[in-house]
From Swiss-Prot:
SUPFAM superfamilies to which the protein is assigned, alphabetical: Enolase C-terminal domain-like, Enolase N-terminal domain-like
Cofactor remark from the record: Binds a second Mg(2+) ion via substrate during catalysis.
Family: Belongs to the enolase family.
InterPro entries: Enolase, Enolase-like_C_sf, Enolase-like_N, Enolase_C, Enolase_CS, Enolase_N
Molecular function in Gene Ontology: magnesium ion binding; phosphopyruvate hydratase activity
Binding site for (2R)-2-phosphoglycerate: Q164, K340, R369, S370, K391
Reaction it catalyzes: (2R)-2-phosphoglycerate = phosphoenolpyruvate + H2O
Protein name: Enolase
EC number(s) on file: 4.2.1.11
Chain sites annotated for binding Mg(2+): D243, E288, D315
Origin species: Lysinibacillus sphaericus (strain C3-41)
Gene name for this UniProt entry: eno
């Protein structure tokens, strides 16, 4: 039987050189699972707590030895010899109860999630099936449309661009493999476009370019130029997406949005006007966190104005939390949720959020964090849930490409049953 014999955690490094938690789960059958927990740069204030040591003499206070110790003592004592790795929901529930706090602040969401994911990997190993098939069953066959962050600003880059992410979505591709090729070709052409204009071509946290530009709108125009230079049609084969990360722009003192790169200050209503103008002018199909996470009136207004034709994704707004999402659904706020496993802390709660979104006609976009690793679990989650969309950076840097390569493998494994729905993945739009 696949009963857990050992749960072991260690401190490893993420893609930004910061410590994170790696967990290994061993079973009496010999089945084994390993996972590495991701970490965010711009975080919502309602996210589950990522436990950091705070010891400034180690890793500038970002060590995770407390979280590691919690896995190797409290969690290990609870799980070893008592649970089968096939009991994912039971184990996740036990971990939540063991922590006992609303935000997983006692043991740390990074400790709990590491165990939750490693257990799933061990179960798939025991059953000798791919992780996506174990998590989703025989009907897991939809490859996601990639939301590829090719130009970075905000908290993800040291430049004057206020908007955190500008992305391309190859909605007109015939397969995931084709979509990835389109994205990569646009990425390389963007480098050439930026170089021709005398802009920097260094990359940010998520692999996208991070130049200083004349305005936020110029980021859109250089990407459109790169799409055409690569031989594709903007608006037909390729749509644009933005993650504004507005909570990073919001000033609590005056209640306004400060776009420091442009030297502009906007009210909530002016931000909505701006998005309406941009989406009328350019082929933008998705906007994430267009307003501050606590500006629900602004989000509601944005949804009323453009929500029928533009995907409005809640990241900091919903933080992968079913209570937050339920409130959004009830109030008509947004039409999509960003799914980040470490915002909530267990696979069970992650899947509950995805199911709730789908039942309400909201899309669920599976997402990485800016601090990633070689762990590609989210690629399997995207296919397991037939989510239809994944956001995991540029086709650059191994920590991002690891997810894309895993999706290529999955598409190969699925063979003729694999589906890539492109624009049909946006079932939330009219």
């Amino acid at each position: 039987m696949p009963f857990i014999t050992q749960v072991y955690a260690r401190e490893v490094l993420d893609s930004r050189g910061n410590p994170t938690v790696e967990v290994e789960v061993f079973t009496e059958s010999g089945a084994f699972g390993r996972s590495i927990v991701p970490s965010g740069a711009s975080t919502g204030e309602y996210e589950a707590v990522e436990l950091r040591d705070g010891d400034k003499s180690r890793y500038l206070g970002k060590g995770v030895l407390k979280a590691v110790e919690n896995v190797n003592t409290i969690i290990a004592q609870e799980l070893e010899g008592n649970y089968s790795v096939l009991d994912q929901v039971v184990i996740d529930k036990a971990l939540i109860e063991l922590d006992g706090t609303e935000n997983k602040g006692k043991l740390g969401a990074n400790a709990i999630l590491g165990v939750s994911m490693a257990v799933a990997h061990a179960a798939a190993d025991y059953l000798d099936v791919p992780l996506y098939q174990y998590l989703g069953g025989f009907n897991s066959k939809q490859l996601p449309v990639p939301m590829m962050n090719i130009l970075n600003g905000g908290a993800h880059a040291d430049n004057n661009v206020d908007i955190q992410e500008f992305m391309v979505m190859p909605v007109g591709a015939e397969s995931f493999r084709h979509a990835l090729r389109i994205g990569a070709e646009i990425f390389h052409n963007l480098k050439a476009v930026l170089k021709d204009k005398g802009y920097n071509t260094a990359v940010g946290d998520e692999g996208g370019f991070a130049p200083n530009l004349g305005s936020n709108e110029e980021a859109i125009t250089v990407i459109l130029e790169a799409i055409e230079k690569a031989g594709y049609k903007p608006g037909e084969e390729v749509k644009l997406a933005m993650d504004v990360a507005s909570s990073e722009l919001f000033n609590k003192e005056d209640g306004k949005y400060h776009l420091d790169g442009e030297g502009v200050v906007k009210t909530s209503e002016e931000m909505v006007d701006w998005y309406e103008e941009l989406t009328n002018k350019y082929p933008i199909i998705s906007i994430e966190d267009g307003l501050d996470e606590n500006d629900w009136a602004g989000h509601k207004l944005l949804t009323e104005r453009i929500g029928s034709r533009v995907q409005l994704v809640g990241d900091d707004l919903f933080v992968t939390n079913t209570k937050k999402l339920a409130a959004g659904i009830e109030q008509g706020v947004g039409n999509s949720i960003l799914i980040k496993v470490n915002q909530i802390g267990t696979l069970t709660e992650t899947f509950e959020a995805i199911e709730m979104a789908k039942r309400a006609g909201y899309t669920a976009v599976i997402s990485h964090r800016s601090g990633e690793s070689e762990d590609a679990t989210i690629a399997d989650i995207a296919v397991a849930t037939n989510a239809g969309q994944i956001k995991t950076g540029a086709p650059s840097r191994t920590d991002r490409v690891a997810k894309y390569n895993q999706l290529l493998r999955i598409e190969d494994q699925l063979g003729s049953t694999a589906e890539y729905l492109g624009l049909k993945s946006f079932y939330n739009l009219k």
